[in-house]
Amino acid sequence: MYKGIFLCVLFAVICANSLAKPSSDADEDNDEVERYVRGWASKIGQTLGKIAKVGLQGLMQPKREAMLRSAEAQGMIGTLTSKRIKQG
């Protein structure tokens, strides 16, 4: 009886051990593809980030200049700076 249980457990351990290890051929191919895709994805992400940063700066700069010009035209810059000088 114990011999049968021992053989059953031994067989289960051997099967589980061999199933846990993937074949080396398939694993190497997957790793190579993952590295290739991961490399391209990070480069694309960095490039898109730089483009977005430059684009946002280009969009925001004219708005700032327009706001400053309108504030100067309305005479608000002098009042705003004088209030800051008095507070400081």
Swiss-Prot record:
<keyword id="KW-0964">Secreted</keyword>
<feature type="modified residue" description="Pyrrolidone carboxylic acid">
    <location>
        <position position="74"/>
    </location>
</feature>
<dbReference type="GO" id="GO:0006952">
    <property type="term" value="P:defense response"/>
</dbReference>
<keyword id="KW-0732">Signal</keyword>
<keyword id="KW-0527">Neuropeptide</keyword>
<comment type="similarity">
    <text>Belongs to the gastrin/cholecystokinin family.</text>
</comment>
<protein>
    <recommendedName>
        <fullName>Prolevitide</fullName>
    </recommendedName>
</protein>
<dbReference type="GO" id="GO:0005179">
    <property type="term" value="F:hormone activity"/>
</dbReference>
<feature type="signal peptide">
    <location>
        <begin position="1"/>
        <end position="20"/>
    </location>
</feature>
<dbReference type="GO" id="GO:0007218">
    <property type="term" value="P:neuropeptide signaling pathway"/>
</dbReference>
<keyword id="KW-0878">Amphibian defense peptide</keyword>
<feature type="modified residue" description="Glutamine amide">
    <location>
        <position position="87"/>
    </location>
</feature>
<keyword id="KW-0372">Hormone</keyword>
<keyword id="KW-0027">Amidation</keyword>
<keyword id="KW-0873">Pyrrolidone carboxylic acid</keyword>
<dbReference type="GO" id="GO:0005576">
    <property type="term" value="C:extracellular region"/>
</dbReference>
